[in-house]
Regions:
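Catalytic Tyr-X3-Lys loop
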Residues: 100-119, 134, 138, 162, ...
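Residue(s) in the substrate-gating loop at a strand-loop-helix junction
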Residues: 142
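A conserved structural motif in NAD(P)-dependent oxidoreductases
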Residues: 208-215
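Active-site helix of classical SDR
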Residues: 122, 158, 166
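Canonical Rossmann dinucleotide-binding motif of NAD(H)/NADP(H)-dependent dehydrogenases/reductases
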Residues: 4-35
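Alpha-helical segment proximal to the catalytic Tyr-Lys
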Residues: 127, 171-175
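Substrate-binding pocket helix/loop in short-chain dehydrogenase/reductase
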Residues: 97-99, 106-108, 193, 200-204
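Active-site loop immediately N-terminal to the catalytic Tyr-X3-Lys motif
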Residues: 100, 147-153, 175-176, 211
Length: 215
């Protein structure tokens, strides 16, 4: 496993109380980074931080679709330290249904979290990175954003939007020592699978040559 030196760096990880976000947080902590995990699930945040028990780990209860809440929290954080790294990992899958039967309210919720949430966090944090001439941003998208999954049009659209946002923002910040990238993982055994129907999970699995999800 590669070793990195993130001493004197501070990272914010959205959706950091479980799954990909939690594993990313642990790697950063192992590398000496100060980590702030953002999640909407207060109970899970508390149990996660208590279990890890690392003085470099803290959390905020954040709804990434709430820009006002984010800007207030960012202001409080940057009054004490810079934000060097942002991992936009928060996301939901929503129900599986064809577009013409998709619940409009749920469609909007998925876009608000998966796409607008990514924008909100970047919009609030990038000014601090520009001021300090340093930043690393990673947006967790999905292979669905490139391929488009049947019966998951909201999720696919939100992740496709996150990929486009990454490309645009990366070009805007290229001369400011701020790198912006996206990762597009396929299926992984996290709690997000619990939001999907068994039929949809099996359809995803059938596309994986090795017949298993990332663990």
């Amino acid at each position: 496993m590669n070793n990195f030196d993130f001493n004197n760096r501070t990272a914010i990880i959205t959706g950091g109380a479980q799954g990909f976000g939690l594993d990313i947080a642990k790697r950063f902590l192992d590398s000496g980074c100060k980590v702030i995990i953002w999640d909407i699930d207060e109970k899970l945040l508390k149990s996660t931080t208590e279990e890890i028990n690392n003085p470099n780990l803290s959390y905020n209860i954040i709804d990434v679709s709430n820009f006002t809440q984010i800007t207030k929290t960012v202001s409080e954080i940057t009054s004490k330290t810079n934000i060097d790294i942002l991992i936009n990992n928060a996301g939901i899958t929503g129900p599986t249904a064809p577009l013409w039967k998709y619940d409009v309210e749920m469609w909007n919720k998925i876009i608000q979290i998966n796409l607008i949430g990514t924008f909100n966090c970047c919009r609030a944090i990038v000014p601090n990175m520009i001021e300090n001439n340093y930043g690393r941003i990673v947006n967790v998208a999905s292979v669905a954003g490139k391929d488009g999954n049947a019966n998951a049009s909201a999720y696919s659209s939100g992740k496709a939007g996150a990929i486009g946002l990454t490309k645009s923002l990366g070009k805007e910040l290229a001369d400011k020592n701020i790198a912006v990238n996206a990762v597009t993982p396929a299926g992984a055994k996290t709690r997000i699978l619990d939001q999907m129907s068994k039929e949809h999970v099996q359809r995803m699995l059938s596309k994986v040559p090795r017949g298993r999800f990332l663990e």
